[in-house]
Protein backbone atom coordinates (compact mmCIF):
# COMPACT_ATOMS: atom_id res chain seq x y z
CA UNK A 1 0.00 0.00 0.00
CA UNK A 2 2.80 2.45 0.93
CA UNK A 3 4.66 1.66 -2.29
CA UNK A 4 1.50 2.17 -4.36
CA UNK A 5 0.80 5.49 -2.65
CA UNK A 6 4.37 6.67 -3.29
CA UNK A 7 4.05 5.80 -6.96
CA UNK A 8 0.75 7.62 -7.37
CA UNK A 9 2.21 10.77 -5.83
CA UNK A 10 5.21 10.61 -8.17
CA UNK A 11 3.04 9.78 -11.19
CA UNK A 12 0.61 12.67 -10.77
CA UNK A 13 3.46 15.09 -10.13
CA UNK A 14 4.96 14.01 -13.44
CA UNK A 15 1.66 14.45 -15.27
CA UNK A 16 1.50 17.97 -13.88
CA UNK A 17 4.97 18.75 -15.21
CA UNK A 18 4.92 20.74 -18.42
CA UNK A 19 8.61 21.48 -18.82
CA UNK A 20 9.94 20.49 -22.24
CA UNK A 21 13.45 21.81 -21.90
CA UNK A 22 16.34 19.60 -22.88
CA UNK A 23 18.20 17.97 -20.07
CA UNK A 24 21.47 19.59 -19.05
CA UNK A 25 23.88 16.74 -18.44
CA UNK A 26 25.89 18.64 -15.83
CA UNK A 27 22.74 19.22 -13.80
CA UNK A 28 21.36 15.69 -13.96
CA UNK A 29 20.68 14.11 -10.58
CA UNK A 30 22.36 10.71 -10.44
CA UNK A 31 20.89 8.00 -8.24
CA UNK A 32 22.09 4.52 -7.27
CA UNK A 33 19.67 2.17 -5.48
CA UNK A 34 20.58 -1.25 -4.06
CA UNK A 35 18.05 -3.87 -2.98
CA UNK A 36 18.06 -6.00 0.14
CA UNK A 37 18.64 -9.74 0.08
CA UNK A 38 21.18 -10.93 2.64
CA UNK A 39 24.08 -12.90 1.20
CA UNK A 40 22.61 -12.33 -2.27
CA UNK A 41 24.15 -8.88 -2.00
CA UNK A 42 27.06 -10.55 -3.78
CA UNK A 43 25.12 -10.14 -7.04
CA UNK A 44 24.87 -6.31 -6.97
CA UNK A 45 28.43 -6.22 -5.60
CA UNK A 46 29.62 -7.82 -8.85
CA UNK A 47 27.70 -5.18 -10.82
CA UNK A 48 29.17 -2.36 -8.73
CA UNK A 49 32.68 -3.71 -9.24
CA UNK A 50 32.17 -3.73 -13.00
CA UNK A 51 30.73 -0.21 -13.05
CA UNK A 52 33.49 1.25 -10.87
CA UNK A 53 36.06 -0.42 -13.12
CA UNK A 54 34.45 1.20 -16.15
CA UNK A 55 34.50 4.61 -14.49
CA UNK A 56 38.19 4.18 -13.68
CA UNK A 57 38.88 3.21 -17.28
CA UNK A 58 36.85 6.03 -18.85
CA UNK A 59 38.42 8.66 -16.60
CA UNK A 60 41.87 7.03 -16.56
CA UNK A 61 41.83 7.22 -12.77
CA UNK A 62 42.37 4.09 -10.69
CA UNK A 63 41.24 6.00 -7.60
CA UNK A 64 37.80 6.84 -9.01
CA UNK A 65 35.01 5.68 -6.70
CA UNK A 66 31.25 5.35 -7.11
CA UNK A 67 30.59 8.04 -4.50
CA UNK A 68 32.33 10.53 -6.81
CA UNK A 69 29.63 10.09 -9.44
CA UNK A 70 26.29 9.59 -7.66
CA UNK A 71 24.37 12.36 -5.92
CA UNK A 72 22.24 9.87 -3.99
CA UNK A 73 23.07 6.29 -3.02
CA UNK A 74 20.27 4.38 -1.33
CA UNK A 75 19.96 0.89 0.03
CA UNK A 76 18.00 -1.35 2.31
CA UNK A 77 19.15 -4.40 4.29
CA UNK A 78 22.27 -5.74 2.57
CA UNK A 79 21.92 -2.85 0.11
CA UNK A 80 22.22 -0.48 3.06
CA UNK A 81 25.45 -2.20 4.02
CA UNK A 82 26.81 -1.75 0.50
CA UNK A 83 25.73 1.89 0.58
CA UNK A 84 27.69 2.47 3.79
CA UNK A 85 30.78 0.68 2.49
CA UNK A 86 31.07 2.88 -0.59
CA UNK A 87 30.15 6.19 1.08
CA UNK A 88 31.81 6.03 4.53
CA UNK A 89 35.09 7.98 4.52
CA UNK A 90 38.47 6.69 5.62
CA UNK A 91 41.20 8.81 7.22
CA UNK A 92 41.90 10.38 3.80
CA UNK A 93 38.23 11.30 3.32
CA UNK A 94 37.85 8.73 0.56
CA UNK A 95 35.49 5.71 0.59
CA UNK A 96 36.92 3.14 2.97
CA UNK A 97 35.96 0.37 0.54
CA UNK A 98 36.36 0.15 -3.21
CA UNK A 99 33.68 -1.81 -5.06
CA UNK A 100 36.16 -4.65 -5.61
CA UNK A 101 36.44 -5.08 -1.83
CA UNK A 102 32.77 -5.95 -1.31
CA UNK A 103 32.68 -9.55 -2.56
CA UNK A 104 35.74 -10.50 -0.46
CA UNK A 105 33.94 -8.93 2.53
CA UNK A 106 31.01 -11.31 2.03
CA UNK A 107 33.31 -14.32 1.67
CA UNK A 108 35.27 -13.44 4.81
CA UNK A 109 32.41 -12.46 7.08
CA UNK A 110 29.28 -14.05 5.61
CA UNK A 111 29.78 -17.50 7.20
CA UNK A 112 30.21 -15.89 10.64
CA UNK A 113 27.25 -13.52 10.22
CA UNK A 114 24.94 -16.36 9.18
CA UNK A 115 26.09 -18.80 11.84
CA UNK A 116 22.97 -20.46 13.28
CA UNK A 117 22.53 -19.61 16.96
CA UNK A 118 20.95 -22.97 17.76
CA UNK A 119 18.14 -21.36 19.72
CA UNK A 120 14.64 -22.73 19.25
CA UNK A 121 13.21 -19.40 20.39
CA UNK A 122 14.23 -15.99 19.16
CA UNK A 123 15.90 -15.17 15.83
CA UNK A 124 17.95 -17.64 13.81
CA UNK A 125 21.14 -15.58 14.20
CA UNK A 126 22.21 -13.60 17.27
CA UNK A 127 23.66 -10.70 15.25
CA UNK A 128 26.66 -10.28 17.55
CA UNK A 129 29.26 -10.91 14.88
CA UNK A 130 27.47 -8.65 12.39
CA UNK A 131 27.39 -5.76 14.84
CA UNK A 132 31.02 -6.35 15.81
CA UNK A 133 32.34 -6.31 12.26
CA UNK A 134 30.28 -3.22 11.42
CA UNK A 135 31.76 -1.40 14.41
CA UNK A 136 35.26 -2.39 13.33
CA UNK A 137 34.78 -1.33 9.71
CA UNK A 138 32.69 1.83 10.11
CA UNK A 139 34.03 3.11 13.43
CA UNK A 140 32.43 6.22 14.89
CA UNK A 141 31.43 7.67 11.52
CA UNK A 142 28.01 9.32 11.45
CA UNK A 143 25.53 10.07 8.69
CA UNK A 144 26.67 13.68 8.16
CA UNK A 145 30.15 12.43 7.22
CA UNK A 146 28.98 10.32 4.27
CA UNK A 147 30.75 11.32 1.07
CA UNK A 148 27.50 11.79 -0.83
CA UNK A 149 23.80 11.85 0.02
CA UNK A 150 22.60 8.50 1.35
CA UNK A 151 19.14 7.02 1.85
CA UNK A 152 19.13 4.02 4.18
CA UNK A 153 15.81 2.73 5.44
CA UNK A 154 14.76 1.00 8.64
CA UNK A 155 11.54 0.55 10.60
CA UNK A 156 10.90 1.53 14.21
CA UNK A 157 8.75 -1.12 15.89
CA UNK A 158 8.02 1.15 18.87
CA UNK A 159 6.66 4.10 16.88
CA UNK A 160 5.45 1.85 14.06
CA UNK A 161 6.98 4.20 11.47
CA UNK A 162 9.70 3.99 8.83
CA UNK A 163 12.98 5.71 9.65
CA UNK A 164 14.99 7.07 6.73
CA UNK A 165 18.59 8.09 7.37
CA UNK A 166 19.71 10.84 4.98
CA UNK A 167 22.12 13.75 5.27
CA UNK A 168 19.53 16.21 4.01
CA UNK A 169 17.17 15.43 6.92
CA UNK A 170 19.69 16.32 9.62
CA UNK A 171 18.97 20.05 9.80
CA UNK A 172 15.36 19.35 10.75
CA UNK A 173 15.99 16.08 12.58
CA UNK A 174 19.50 16.04 14.12
CA UNK A 175 18.63 12.89 16.05
CA UNK A 176 18.98 11.02 12.73
CA UNK A 177 22.73 11.69 12.72
CA UNK A 178 23.37 8.19 14.03
CA UNK A 179 26.52 6.13 13.78
CA UNK A 180 26.77 4.28 10.50
CA UNK A 181 27.28 0.92 12.17
CA UNK A 182 24.03 1.32 14.11
CA UNK A 183 22.22 2.21 10.90
CA UNK A 184 23.72 -0.70 8.97
CA UNK A 185 22.82 -3.25 11.61
CA UNK A 186 19.31 -1.83 11.86
CA UNK A 187 18.59 -1.94 8.14
CA UNK A 188 19.84 -5.55 8.05
CA UNK A 189 17.96 -6.75 11.16
CA UNK A 190 15.39 -8.81 9.28
CA UNK A 191 12.66 -10.24 11.50
CA UNK A 192 13.15 -13.99 12.10
CA UNK A 193 16.83 -13.72 11.11
CA UNK A 194 18.34 -11.09 13.46
CA UNK A 195 17.29 -9.35 16.69
CA UNK A 196 15.94 -5.79 16.48
CA UNK A 197 18.47 -3.08 17.27
CA UNK A 198 18.17 -0.54 20.09
CA UNK A 199 20.36 2.55 20.30
CA UNK A 200 20.09 6.20 21.28
CA UNK A 201 21.07 9.56 19.83
CA UNK A 202 20.29 13.09 20.99
CA UNK A 203 17.93 15.79 19.80
CA UNK A 204 18.94 19.41 19.20
CA UNK A 205 17.92 20.11 22.82
CA UNK A 206 20.21 17.39 24.11
CA UNK A 207 17.35 15.05 24.98
CA UNK A 208 17.79 11.32 24.50
CA UNK A 209 16.15 9.91 21.38
CA UNK A 210 15.51 6.17 21.26
CA UNK A 211 15.46 3.88 18.23
CA UNK A 212 13.99 0.36 18.17
CA UNK A 213 14.71 -0.72 14.62
CA UNK A 214 14.32 -3.68 12.29
CA UNK A 215 15.14 -4.39 8.66
CA UNK A 216 14.58 -1.58 6.20
CA UNK A 217 12.75 -4.04 3.98
CA UNK A 218 9.78 -3.71 6.32
CA UNK A 219 9.57 -0.07 5.20
CA UNK A 220 10.53 -0.41 1.53
CA UNK A 221 9.86 -4.13 0.94
CA UNK A 222 13.37 -4.80 -0.30
CA UNK A 223 13.58 -2.34 -3.19
CA UNK A 224 14.51 1.22 -2.13
CA UNK A 225 14.39 2.75 -5.62
CA UNK A 226 11.28 4.86 -4.97
CA UNK A 227 12.76 6.05 -1.70
CA UNK A 228 16.03 6.97 -3.41
CA UNK A 229 14.14 8.85 -6.12
CA UNK A 230 12.16 10.84 -3.56
CA UNK A 231 15.38 11.87 -1.81
CA UNK A 232 16.88 12.84 -5.17
CA UNK A 233 13.79 14.90 -6.00
CA UNK A 234 14.12 16.84 -2.76
CA UNK A 235 17.84 17.32 -3.41
CA UNK A 236 17.08 18.74 -6.86
CA UNK A 237 14.65 21.23 -5.35
CA UNK A 238 16.94 22.39 -2.55
CA UNK A 239 20.48 22.29 -4.00
CA UNK A 240 21.52 25.33 -6.12
CA UNK A 241 23.68 23.00 -8.24
CA UNK A 242 20.47 21.77 -9.86
CA UNK A 243 18.93 25.19 -10.51
CA UNK A 244 17.76 24.31 -14.02
CA UNK A 245 15.30 21.76 -12.64
CA UNK A 246 12.30 24.01 -12.13
CA UNK A 247 9.88 21.15 -11.53
CA UNK A 248 9.95 17.39 -11.31
CA UNK A 249 11.61 16.44 -14.60
CA UNK A 250 12.73 12.86 -15.07
CA UNK A 251 14.72 13.86 -18.12
CA UNK A 252 17.23 15.11 -15.58
CA UNK A 253 17.21 12.02 -13.36
CA UNK A 254 19.62 9.16 -13.97
CA UNK A 255 18.68 6.07 -11.94
CA UNK A 256 20.58 2.79 -11.63
CA UNK A 257 18.69 0.20 -9.58
CA UNK A 258 20.40 -3.06 -8.60
CA UNK A 259 18.48 -6.15 -7.51
CA UNK A 260 19.66 -9.19 -5.57
CA UNK A 261 17.84 -11.70 -7.75
CA UNK A 262 14.45 -13.37 -7.75
CA UNK A 263 13.18 -16.87 -8.42
CA UNK A 264 11.51 -17.14 -11.81
CA UNK A 265 9.89 -20.40 -10.76
CA UNK A 266 8.09 -18.78 -7.84
CA UNK A 267 4.80 -18.55 -9.72
CA UNK A 268 4.90 -22.30 -10.42
CA UNK A 269 5.63 -23.29 -6.85
CA UNK A 270 2.07 -23.30 -5.57
CA UNK A 271 -1.36 -24.20 -6.85
CA UNK A 272 -4.72 -23.16 -5.47
CA UNK A 273 -5.34 -26.78 -4.48
CA UNK A 274 -2.12 -26.89 -2.45
CA UNK A 275 -2.67 -23.52 -0.79
CA UNK A 276 -6.19 -24.49 0.24
CA UNK A 277 -4.64 -26.96 2.68
CA UNK A 278 -2.24 -24.49 4.33
CA UNK A 279 -2.43 -23.42 7.93
CA UNK A 280 -1.56 -19.96 9.33
CA UNK A 281 2.20 -20.62 9.65
CA UNK A 282 2.56 -21.86 6.08
CA UNK A 283 0.64 -18.85 4.81
CA UNK A 284 2.87 -16.46 6.80
CA UNK A 285 5.99 -17.80 5.10
CA UNK A 286 4.41 -17.78 1.66
CA UNK A 287 2.96 -14.29 2.02
CA UNK A 288 6.40 -12.89 2.90
CA UNK A 289 7.83 -14.39 -0.30
CA UNK A 290 4.88 -13.23 -2.39
CA UNK A 291 5.01 -9.69 -1.00
CA UNK A 292 8.73 -9.32 -1.69
CA UNK A 293 8.45 -10.72 -5.21
CA UNK A 294 5.37 -8.67 -6.09
CA UNK A 295 6.77 -5.45 -4.63
CA UNK A 296 10.05 -5.75 -6.53
CA UNK A 297 8.16 -6.27 -9.77
CA UNK A 298 5.68 -3.46 -9.16
CA UNK A 299 8.34 -0.95 -8.10
CA UNK A 300 10.20 -1.60 -11.35
CA UNK A 301 6.94 -1.31 -13.28
CA UNK A 302 6.01 1.97 -11.61
CA UNK A 303 9.40 3.56 -12.17
CA UNK A 304 9.56 2.38 -15.78
CA UNK A 305 6.15 3.96 -16.33
CA UNK A 306 7.11 7.37 -14.97
CA UNK A 307 10.35 7.50 -16.94
CA UNK A 308 8.58 6.45 -20.13
CA UNK A 309 5.90 9.07 -19.51
CA UNK A 310 8.65 11.70 -19.72
CA UNK A 311 10.33 10.00 -22.71
CA UNK A 312 13.32 9.29 -20.48
CA UNK A 313 13.40 5.49 -20.46
CA UNK A 314 17.13 5.45 -21.20
CA UNK A 315 17.72 7.28 -17.92
CA UNK A 316 16.58 4.26 -15.89
CA UNK A 317 18.36 0.92 -15.71
CA UNK A 318 17.17 -1.94 -13.53
CA UNK A 319 19.75 -4.73 -13.23
CA UNK A 320 18.04 -7.86 -11.96
CA UNK A 321 18.43 -11.64 -12.30
CA UNK A 322 15.00 -13.26 -12.48
CA UNK A 323 16.05 -16.89 -12.76
CA UNK A 324 17.66 -17.82 -9.46
CA UNK A 325 17.43 -21.50 -8.60
CA UNK A 326 18.38 -23.81 -5.76
CA UNK A 327 20.47 -22.43 -2.92
CA UNK A 328 21.04 -19.08 -4.66
CA UNK A 329 17.47 -18.11 -3.74
CA UNK A 330 18.31 -18.25 -0.02
CA UNK A 331 19.29 -14.97 1.66
CA UNK A 332 21.24 -16.74 4.44
CA UNK A 333 23.17 -19.54 2.70
CA UNK A 334 26.71 -18.27 3.22
CA UNK A 335 28.44 -21.53 2.35
CA UNK A 336 31.47 -21.04 0.12
CA UNK A 337 29.86 -23.15 -2.59
CA UNK A 338 26.73 -20.98 -2.68
CA UNK A 339 28.68 -17.72 -2.58
CA UNK A 340 30.71 -18.94 -5.57
CA UNK A 341 27.43 -19.63 -7.36
CA UNK A 342 26.23 -16.09 -6.59
CA UNK A 343 29.44 -14.69 -8.07
CA UNK A 344 28.74 -16.70 -11.22
CA UNK A 345 25.17 -15.37 -11.29
CA UNK A 346 26.45 -11.79 -11.18
CA UNK A 347 29.08 -12.35 -13.85
CA UNK A 348 26.63 -14.15 -16.14
CA UNK A 349 24.04 -11.43 -15.62
CA UNK A 350 26.38 -8.87 -17.17
CA UNK A 351 26.25 -10.81 -20.45
CA UNK A 352 22.45 -11.06 -20.54
CA UNK A 353 20.19 -8.70 -22.52
CA UNK A 354 18.51 -5.91 -20.59
CA UNK A 355 15.15 -7.04 -21.97
CA UNK A 356 13.76 -9.50 -24.47
CA UNK A 357 13.04 -6.57 -26.79
CA UNK A 358 16.57 -5.16 -26.69
CA UNK A 359 19.88 -6.65 -27.87
CA UNK A 360 21.78 -4.40 -25.43
CA UNK A 361 23.38 -6.40 -22.61
CA UNK A 362 23.66 -5.22 -19.03
CA UNK A 363 27.39 -4.89 -19.59
CA UNK A 364 26.82 -2.58 -22.55
CA UNK A 365 24.18 -0.59 -20.68
CA UNK A 366 26.51 -0.11 -17.71
CA UNK A 367 29.27 1.07 -20.04
CA UNK A 368 26.79 3.61 -21.43
CA UNK A 369 25.92 4.71 -17.90
CA UNK A 370 29.61 5.00 -17.02
CA UNK A 371 30.19 7.39 -19.93
CA UNK A 372 27.19 9.49 -18.92
CA UNK A 373 28.37 9.63 -15.31
CA UNK A 374 31.90 10.53 -16.36
CA UNK A 375 30.81 13.27 -18.78
CA UNK A 376 28.42 14.74 -16.24
CA UNK A 377 31.16 14.85 -13.59
CA UNK A 378 33.55 16.62 -15.98
CA UNK A 379 30.92 19.15 -17.08
CA UNK A 380 30.00 19.90 -13.49
CA UNK A 381 33.67 20.38 -12.57
CA UNK A 382 34.13 22.77 -15.51
CA UNK A 383 31.03 24.73 -14.53
CA UNK A 384 32.24 25.04 -10.93
CA UNK A 385 35.60 26.41 -12.08
CA UNK A 386 34.00 29.49 -13.70
Swiss-Prot record:
Alphabetically, which GO biological process terms does the record hold? Answer: defense response; lipid catabolic process
In its keyword annotation, does this UniProt entry include Transferase?
no
In the record, what terms sit under GO molecular function? monoacylglycerol lipase activity; nutrient reservoir activity; phospholipase activity
Record EC number: 3.1.1.-
Pfam families attached to this UniProt entry: Patatin
Coiled-coil annotated spans: 321-384
Which tissues and organs express this gene's product? Tuber.
| UniProt keyword Signal present | yes
InterPro entries attached to this UniProt entry: Acyl_Trfase/lysoPLipase, PNPLA_dom
- Motif DGA/G: positions: 215-217
List the ranges annotated as motif GXSXG.
75-79
SUPFAM superfamilies given in the database record:
FabD/lysophospholipase-like
In this chain the PNPLA domain maps to 32-229
Q: Its domain of life? A: Eukaryota
Give the free-text miscellaneous remark of the entry. Answer: Patatin have a dual role as a somatic storage protein and as an enzyme involved in host resistance.
Query: What does this protein's UniProt record list under function?
Result: Probable lipolytic acyl hydrolase (LAH), an activity which is thought to be involved in the response of tubers to pathogens.
So what family is this one in?
Answer: Belongs to the patatin family.
Q: What is known of its domains?
A: The nitrogen atoms of the two glycine residues in the GGXR motif define the oxyanion hole, and stabilize the oxyanion that forms during the nucleophilic attack by the catalytic serine during substrate cleavage.
- What's the protein name? Patatin-10
**What organism does this protein naturally occur in?**
Solanum tuberosum
Taxonomic placement: Eukaryota, Viridiplantae, Streptophyta, Embryophyta, Tracheophyta
